[in-house]
Design a protein with these regions (language model features):
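Activation corresponds to long, low-complexity, non-globular regions
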Residues: 14, 131-212
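Structural motif
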Residues: 34-46
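Low-complexity, Pro/Ser/Thr- and charge-rich linker/hinge segments at domain boundaries
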Residues: 107-141
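Contiguous beta-strand segments within globular domains
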Residues: 25-36
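Hydrophobic membrane-insertion alpha-helices, especially the h-region
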Residues: 7-25
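Positively charged n-region of N-terminal signal peptides that target proteins for export
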Residues: 1-6
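Tryptophan-paired
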Residues: 48-94
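Short acidic/polar inter-strand loop motif in beta-rich domains
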Residues: 93-102
Length: 212
C-alpha cells in the first residue's frame, strides 16, 4: 500500500507540474496582426512567423504580383493566441531577377534588446514585413506603448529551388516554371521588368510608421 501511495503521489505531482507549465505557457500567448508589402513583383510560396519549437505559426496575406508598393499594405492578417515570434520563414520567387529565395531567419538576433522589450510587454502587436529587390527583407514591430521599431533587416541569398518550389498546378522543371510564372503576369508588369522599373535600391529604407 505504501508503494501505491507513493506512485499516486508521484502521479499527482507530475499532473500539478504539467498544469503549472501549461498555465505559464498560456499566459505568454498574445494576439498580433501581420502586414506584408513588396517593392517588386513576387510569387510567394510561404511566409510565416514562428516561435521556437511550438506549433504556433503567424500567417501573412500574400502579395499580388500585379498590385504592390513599398510600405503600402492591406489587408492585415490576424493571428490569435500565439507565442511571441522569434523567427521568420520566407520562400518566394522574384520576377525581377528570376531567382528563388528561401531562408529561416532569427528575429531576436538582429536587435535583441528591442525584441526582448516587445516580447516582455505582452501587448497586441503588428508585425510589418517588407520585401525589397535583391533579397532584402525588413521586419518592424508596432504596439501602443513602444511605437514602431525595426526588429530585423537582412539580405537573403538566392537558392536553387527544390521540387516543391517548382510546383504550380503541376510539377515543372526550373526553366518551365519560370516561363509559366511570366505567362501568368500582365504585359505591363513584364514590360516594367524588362525596362528595370523595379530596380530601386530600398536596403536603407528603414524608416517606417504604421498608419492608423
Amino acid at each position: 500500500m505504501n508503494i501505491l501511495n507513493k506512485i499516486y503521489s508521484l502521479l499527482i505531482l507530475i499532473v500539478i507540474v504539467l498544469a503549472v507549465i501549461a498555465f505559464i505557457d498560456r499566459s505568454k500567448k498574445i494576439d498580433y496582426s501581420t502586414l506584408l508589402f513588396t517593392s517588386e513583383p513576387l510569387r510567394v510560396r510561404e511566409i510565416y512567423l514562428k516561435s521556437g519549437n511550438s506549433d504556433d505559426y503567424g500567417n501573412f496575406n500574400y502579395p499580388n504580383p500585379e498590385y504592390f508598393a513599398w510600405k503600402q499594405s492591406e489587408p492585415s492578417s490576424d493571428n490569435r493566441f500565439l507565442n511571441f515570434p522569434d523567427s521568420l520563414s520566407v520562400t518566394y520567387f522574384s520576377y525581377t531577377d528570376s531567382l528563388f529565395y528561401h531562408s529561416n531567419v532569427s528575429i531576436r538576433d538582429f536587435n535583441p534588446e528591442a525584441w526582448k522589450e516587445y516580447k516582455k510587454a505582452g501587448e497586441y502587436n503588428t508585425f510589418s514585413l517588407g520585401i525589397a529587390n535583391k533579397g532584402w527583407i525588413m521586419l518592424w514591430c508596432t504596439n501602443d506603448s513602444k511605437g514602431t521599431t525595426l526588429l530585423l533587416k537582412t539580405q537573403l541569398k538566392p537558392v536553387e529551388p527544390g521540387p516543391q518550389d517548382l510546383y504550380y498546378i503541376k510539377q515543372y522543371n526550373k526553366q518551365d516554371y519560370i516561363t509559366e510564372m511570366f505567362d501568368n503576369i500582365s504585359d505591363s508588369i513584364r514590360l516594367n521588368i524588362k525596362n528595370h522599373y523595379y530596380n530601386t535600391d530600398y536596403q536603407d529604407s528603414t524608416d517606417y510608421s504604421l498608419k492608423p
